[in-house]
Amino acid sequence: VDPLVQKLSGHDLFRTYCASCHGPTGAGDGPVAPSMRRKPANLRQIAKRNGGVYPSELVYRVIDGRQPVRGHGGPDMPVWGDVFARSSQVRDEAVITARIEALVRHLEALQARTAN
């Protein structure tokens, strides 16, 4: 596995690849957001928009992007599976999977907590 993947946490990957659009906390308020046609999603509300359940498999597929998910993502969101494949020296699917899984876990940790 790519040593870079072993060193980068989901937080680091998010900061590198996602925060410019989605903001440092995932609220959809990154510095690039005002110039976009569609406002980036508030990633802290994924579970709330899904009846209180964090849909990790769906989030994985949306981030990967190589198999479009109807109604999710969009033309402004890069196909991260391809981006990670190009950035990996060995183009190892395990590296791509590890990066996306780290992002999925990080996004799960960002979910806004609601009072019961």
Where are these regions (language model features)?
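Activation segment of ePK-like protein kinases, specifically the conserved APE
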Residues: 26, 67, 111-112
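Post-cleavage N-terminal segment of exported redox proteins
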Residues: 1-6, 104-116
